């Protein structure tokens, strides 16, 4: 599944992106971010991160540097660990 998603991203970068121009407000671009997220986190979580990123890329966003979080910084896992530590 990861291979298919990455192939679709490559197609987008080669065929579609040049027609739209450079509109991304972030570094790396949203398509590069999506590719990295899928490679580091797998198809499901990587797609989720990519969709969140694309939703943040709009004219009212300040943009800037927004790197893919490392695989071991899963906020859900941290939240679940905190919840377990507070159980009686």
Swiss-Prot record:
Pfam families per record: YidD
Annotated region described as Disordered, given as residue ranges: 68-88
Matching InterPro entries: Membr_insert_effic_factor_YidD
Topology class, membrane: Peripheral membrane protein
GO CC terms, sorted: plasma membrane
Organism domain of life: Bacteria
Disulphide linkage map: none
Composition bias type Basic and acidic residues, residue spans: 75-88
Parts of the chain that traverse the membrane: none
Key word Membrane present: yes
Subcellular location: Cell inner membrane
Keyword Membrane: yes
Keywords attached to this entry: Cell inner membrane, Cell membrane, Membrane
Known role: Could be involved in insertion of integral membrane proteins into the membrane.
PANTHER family: MEMBRANE PROTEIN INSERTION EFFICIENCY FACTOR-RELATED
Family statement: Belongs to the UPF0161 family.
The name this protein goes by in its record: Putative membrane protein insertion efficiency factor
Protein source organism: Burkholderia ambifaria (strain MC40-6)
